[in-house]
Amino acid sequence: MIPPDNYIIFLKFSEQRWIDSLVNGNFSFSCVGKFIQQAQATGDTVQGDSFKGYFARLKKDDKRLTIMRSRLKDDLEESNDGNYVLLRRKSALTVPIFCIYGYQCIDAVNEAPSSGKTRIRHNFDARLFDAFANKWNSSIVADDRRATYVILQARAFANRIAEMRDKELKNMLKKQRRERKALANRVLADRIQYDIDERGEFFINPTDNYPELLHKRCEYAYQYETRIYFPDIHLSHIFDRKSVAVSAFDKSCLL
C-alpha cells in the first residue's frame, strides 16, 4: 500500500534561468517579504500575496493580543482590518523559502490508495500557467527570463532535500566548532495547509519553527504547494537569496 501522503510528482514553474539552475542542483531560496512586495507593486496575486505570513486575525479585544505584544515585542507587526487586527512577525518575512508544486497520492484519490496499479490523471489548474506566463512573456524579452517549468520525479527530489539537510548540518557543525557556541540550521519541509479564511478569525501559535509559513488562504488550494525553509536563518534583505548546491538531476529524474 502506498501511504496517502507520498508524493507522485513535483512541478516547478519559474523563469528559465531558475529552472536551469534547479536542474543543475542549485536550489535558490527567496522569502515571503519579496512575494508580499511583488503583490503590492504589481498586483500579481498568484505568485505574490500580501496576506502571506500572518499568524493571526483577532478581534481587537482578544486577550491574546496583549500576550503576543508582550511575547514578540518589536518583532510584532499589527495591521487593522475592520474590527480585527492582523498579526505578523517581521522576522517571518526574511526566512529563506523554496516553493514547489507537490502532488500527493491523497490528492489523486478520495481515500488512501490500495495495493495494485492505479492510473492517475491530473489536470493542472490553468491559473498556474496563465498568470505566470502572461506576466513574464508579455513584459520580458530575454530568453533566460521567460516562463517555463520542469516536472521532477518525486523520489529524486526527496533525495535532494535529504542531501541538503546533511550538507547544512555539516556546515552548521563546522561553524559551531569555529565560533564555539550553540547554533541551529534546520531545513524544514512540509505541505502548505490552505485553511486561512481572511474574513474569519484564526490563530497560529508563532513558535521558532515559523508554522505560519505553512498556511495560506483557502483560495490558493489549487497550487498544491510544498515549502522548504530555514527557520533559523534570515536574509539581510527581502531581495536577497540563499543558494544551496546539491546533486544535479539527470534525465531519468525529469518527467
Residue spans of the language-model regions?
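NAD-dependent ADP-ribosyltransferases
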Residues: 1-255
